[in-house]
Amino acid sequence: MTQILSRISNPGDLQRLSATELDQLAKEIREVIIQTTSKNGGHLAPNLGVVELTLALHLVFQSPKDKIIWDVGHQSYVHKLLTGRYNHFHTLRRYKGMAGFPKRSESEHDVFNTGHSSTSISAALGFAFARDLKKEDGAVIAVIGDGALTGGIALEALNHAGHAGNDMIVVLNDNEKSIADNVGAMSTYLSRIRTDPRYFRNKEEVEEIVRRIPSIGNHVLKVMEKMKDSFKHLVVPGILFEELGFSYLGPIDGHNLSQLREVMTNACRLKGPILVHVLTKKGKGYGPAETNPSVFHGVGPFDVETGKVKKHLGPPTYTQVFSDTLLRLAREDERIVGVTAAMPDGTGMTPFARAFPSRFFDVGIAEQHAVNMSAALALQGLKPVVAIYSTFLQRAYDQVFHDVCLQRAPVVFAIDRGGIVGDDGETHHGLFDIAFLRHIPELVMMAPKDENELQHMLRTALEYEGPIAVRYPRGTGVGVTLDEELTTVPIGRGELLRQGSDVTIVAIGAMVGIAEEAADLLEAEGIRAAVVNARFVKPLDKELIIKQARETGRIVTVEEHVLAGGFGSAILELLEMEGVHCAVRRIGIPDEYVQHGSVSVLREDYGLTASNVARVARELADADRSRASIRMAPPAPIKIAFRGESR
């Protein structure tokens, strides 16, 4: 099946292959990617669309001397296969296996880590500046999709790169034809002329000859320039890039390997910033992915023959419950509007968009704009719900502070993927939102213990007259019955789920269920553990927490979030401010990035399990009962098995 691919240990091996063998290699690459993602899940459609493009890049350029930066990184699988990682490709996105995104620690060919969108052009310009300052050689290439090009940072980088004028190449992988649709003989001919260095040399020679014509030379040049500009505006879709200072080449058929090689070869001979516009088809070579590219953009395990995604039977996902509840509430209140940043499917906003198209705003990959715009919507009496992944909300931090909270604009943040998300790894885990949101004045933040509480919290958020966030995890709910009638949750009120006199376990969000399981384990040992569902990160239920601290003298906090600045830190701050002496242990994520792997495996690795919570509570209950001071657990003397402070 992989007679050629299995022999590729580095990009240089491609030079020995004939055109026929390269075509066969492209087929083998597609087959390996399809088979692997069908088992492991992953970004299938983007990678199938860049097979020929990636081959052309590695045939023309010499990685890693020539630096190729993959924007977002969704489309880096082909690159990984061509850079000596074929034998490990079966571990893609598996725990301690190959990452699903470029990773510098994985290969010298991965020159810049990516995972979030629109960063490649900035990185490429930085590499170009460094190369020129150090008087080194080597090309720099950024590969960016038309979707990622909507990101503000990408446009900022284009503006700077065009002004700076350093040699670099931006490959625009246009797989939705959102910029142009003019592929054909004329565009191919124009591209060949404009990518040939002789065009630039002849252009300069002609200009010099005309300039020497007595009296009228300069005038003729101006007329010629106007004619050229008019012609370019008529037939060349890249005039925007040329106005920014780039030489525009394209559009190019992204599945014609020989044409891609020719254009890339000519592009690397040109001076200054170059933009190569390549048209590709997402999902190329696999029928189901070509038909439904959005479904197969990021997909779980699926049946290769039928293309059907393997769905796990069970409770609805938190995203689905959010989606259904929002739709239900929006039918009752026409002031509710939905906002997302290029993630309508992932955030569950698609049903809302279909039901209320005039009340739905997909702003593209522009989180800052989404939040800023939502503040204005809220100040005009509407009820904007910004549905966004936790990791992507980081991009709009200043807007949350400056445009929403400072004005106390009643914007609802539906923060999806709060916590460990699994196989996409460190760039996608939502482990920092509590820390970067809870210290902003005026912002209320809550997290439901289950899917039923989520729907009540969404109603609460939409009735609250100020900025408010609801944080919920990826994946299925716990399987509780969903109430028909939606009620509001009192702001800042937690819930005592279980009485106990020996120790109190205070948990937030999805960790509440684990805390209850831990209490069951402790009860079997004769240890009476109280369990508190905090519900609110901010404001905390001061009365309940202080009461429990004084009654039991011991608190264990549990959060699926970093310990630094997190929920446990908020509890410690509260106890210190109120002068309450209580032994405290915090369980959460330490000061490190969490790698990729299944949610269950990673929770086990970091001690976010009932058995570990019970162990920590047991040790605390058996320890010195003195309440003279708030104590922290000592750091682990060996490699952390349960990577919280609670080792």
From Swiss-Prot:
Stated role: Catalyzes the acyloin condensation reaction between C atoms 2 and 3 of pyruvate and glyceraldehyde 3-phosphate to yield 1-deoxy-D-xylulose-5-phosphate (DXP).
Pathway named in the protein's UniProt entry: Metabolic intermediate biosynthesis; 1-deoxy-D-xylulose 5-phosphate biosynthesis; 1-deoxy-D-xylulose 5-phosphate from D-glyceraldehyde 3-phosphate and pyruvate: step 1/1
NCBIfam families: dxs (TIGR00204), PRK05444.2-2 (NF003933)
HAMAP family: DXP_synth (MF_00315)
PANTHER family: 1-D-DEOXYXYLULOSE 5-PHOSPHATE SYNTHASE-RELATED, 1-DEOXY-D-XYLULOSE-5-PHOSPHATE SYNTHASE, CHLOROPLASTIC
Protein name: 1-deoxy-D-xylulose-5-phosphate synthase
InterPro entries registered for this protein in UniProt: Dxylulose-5-P_synthase, THDP-binding, Transketo_C/PFOR_II, Transketolase-like_Pyr-bd, Transketolase_BS, Transketolase_C, Transketolase_CS
Catalysis: reaction(s): D-glyceraldehyde 3-phosphate + pyruvate + H(+) = 1-deoxy-D-xylulose 5-phosphate + CO2
Residues where thiamine diphosphate binds: 74, 115-117, 147-148, 175, 286, 367
Enzyme class: transferase
Superkingdom in the source lineage: Bacteria
Cofactor note: Binds 1 Mg(2+) ion per subunit. Binds 1 thiamine pyrophosphate per subunit.
GO CC terms: cytosol
Assembly and interaction partners: Homodimer.
UniProt entry tagged with the keyword Cytoplasm: no
